[in-house]
């Protein structure tokens, strides 16, 4: 049995952790939070990828409408990501506070989000994926590919 075949990732193998996180993000994009959580639960030590794992865990719980449960991982993600990269976590955290009836915390968290000046409150935001998987991801990038 290889390390990759193991159901649970023990120790920090960056390639496997990134693969699991990319799978979790893909499941979230497909609206399958249960599968995303299964991928996240298989990673016992995300190492330096902990902020991403926390963000995805919070988003999966939010998608399951478990807002109170989503608050802790989203809060950790918002703290672990440096500003302005924590905006996605802060937006999700604000929504979870609001859905959980904690309006004051929701407003305070939303106020911490640094939006560009041209974004109005009614603007629909599209959050870009963290991992971008391409069909031909196996090749190396050479100097001429830049």
Give a label for each model feature.
Residues 18, 52, 86-88, 122:
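Start-of-helix register in tetratricopeptide repeats
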Residues 74-80, 91-121:
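TPR/TPR-like (Sel1-like) alpha-helical repeat modules
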Residues 22, 56, 92, 126-129:
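"A position-specific structural signal for the A-helix of alpha-solenoid helical repeats
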Residues 13-45:
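Alpha-helical segment of the N-proximal tetratricopeptide repeat
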């Amino acid at each position: 049995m290889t390390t990759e075949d193991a159901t649970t990732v023990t120790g920090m193998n960056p390639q496997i952790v990134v693969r699991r996180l990319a799978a979790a993000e893909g499941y979230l994009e497909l609206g399958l939070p249960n599968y995303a959580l299964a991928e996240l639960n298989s990673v016992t030590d995300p190492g330096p990828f902990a902020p991403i794992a926390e963000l995805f865990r919070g988003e999966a719980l939010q998608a399951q409408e478990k807002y109170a449960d989503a608050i802790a991982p989203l809060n950790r993600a918002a703290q672990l990501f440096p500003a302005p990269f924590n905006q996605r976590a802060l937006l999700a955290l604000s929504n979870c506070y609001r859905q959980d009836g904690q309006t004051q915390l929701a407003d305070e968290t939303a106020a911490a989000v640094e939006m560009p000046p041209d974004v109005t409150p009614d603007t629909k935001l599209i959050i870009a994926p963290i991992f971008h998987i391409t069909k031909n991801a196996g090749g190396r990038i050479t100097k001429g590919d830049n």
